[in-house]
Amino acid sequence: MRPAQDNQGSFLGRISIRRNQFVDVNNEQEQEDLELFQKHIADRFTELLSPPQPPPSDEINTVASVAATEQIMSVTWLRKLMDVFLCCEAEFKAILLMGRDPTQISKPPFDRLVPEMLDRSIKALDICTAVVNGIDSVRHYQRLAEIAVTALEQRPLGDGNVRRAKRALANLVVALSLEDKENVSGGGGGGGGGNKTTERSWSFGRRSGGSSAASKGGATIGQLKSSSWAVGRNWSAAKQIHAMTANLTPPRGNEAAGLPQPMFIMSTVMVFVMWVLTAAVPCQERSGLANHLPVPPKHLNWAQSLIGIHEKIGDEWKKKEKKGSAGLMEEMTRMEKLGHSLMEFADGFHYPAEKDAAESAAVQVAEMAEICRRMEEELVPLQQQIREVFHRIVRSRAEILEVLEQAGKVSAPVV
């Protein structure tokens, strides 16, 4: 899969000329950097908004149509979204930190904006943890679908094969329609596979810094050498996302032309990406997220495609919320439809199968098999990318805290 790097290489190459030099950043140069950053954001999300469309069904068979994997919310698309986030984050960090006097980001309004951004990053870590756990549930759905496919591919197709497929399909359909908390926390009804979100955690280490400077972003610098992250039983994705949007407002006046602007953009991108992930897979307590995610003003050019993606996903989420859904991942949505259709075939099956019904079912089984194949290839790499996002956020947060500590030492009075 081609990373969504765009012009990042040339941008970072040029900006790194100022690496390790504490100089006054030229205003004209900074404006050019900010404009490039906004352009790259717009370009990357435009590509995500308009993925290649599958060919008309009259030109290719159904299975080949399913192979067009880059639709919004497909596993392949979600992997591209992770690449986009990582590219945006790297470019933003270059703007924020490279060659900048550390005391600059400790002064107003950054003494407020930076801690708020660091606090959002902590909440994003929780969401990454929950989403990786949710993908484990999706892999369980995949296994149920594979059982049904294997049974229905047998020739000649007998009553025993159909009964085996029917049991797997029944569990699959129930799992895919469970409400969020049931699906992720409970693991009941054959849907969650005993997945215990409350027991999953990651640990990460930070270098110990000085003991004097403190961060309003959630931790004293150097206070903890390691932290453990786990999603509790009463944890709520909706509350987490809403908390991330607190105080997330576009900069005004002079701030709109300076560093607060990319800070707002990156925070918006982070919240949006976490919102998409919670929509895609089983995740605890998502009630209301389809309607209440704040989006940036439409007059901002960099935000147009992001808003377009938000609207597409939000509309689909509202439909699914009414009847209950484990997630909006494209493969899961298609799997649910095929599961219902194959259940109808199994309910009406009598040996020997009617020719037309058997042929129609065979096409659907082949499509289900293709979905399972894609999941087998893509779900684990998606989990790995989300872990990479997690650790990138951890590293960037530590680097920003380090810069704040340096600023504290520089500004401390000499005794």
From Swiss-Prot:
The chain crosses the membrane at residues 263-283. It is a single-pass membrane protein. One of its GO terms (biological process) is mucilage biosynthetic process involved in seed coat development. Disruption phenotype: Reduced pectin deposition leading to reduced seed coat mucilage thickness. Characteristic pattern of pectin deposition to the corners of seed coat volcano cells. GO terms for cellular component: cytosol; membrane. Pfam families: ROH1-like. Residues 184-219 are annotated as: Disordered. Residues 200-219 have a biased composition (Low complexity). InterPro entries: ROH1-like. Signal peptide: none annotated. Disulfide bonds: none annotated. Mainly expressed in cells expanding in a polar manner such as pollen and root hairs. It is found in: Membrane; Cytoplasm, Cytosol. Residues 185-195 have a biased composition (Gly residues). Keywords: Cytoplasm, Developmental protein, Membrane, Transmembrane, Transmembrane helix. Required for seed coat mucilage deposition. Belongs to the ROH1 family. 'Roh' means corner in Czech. Interacts with EXO70A1 and EXO70C1. Binds to EXO70C2. This is Protein ROH1A.
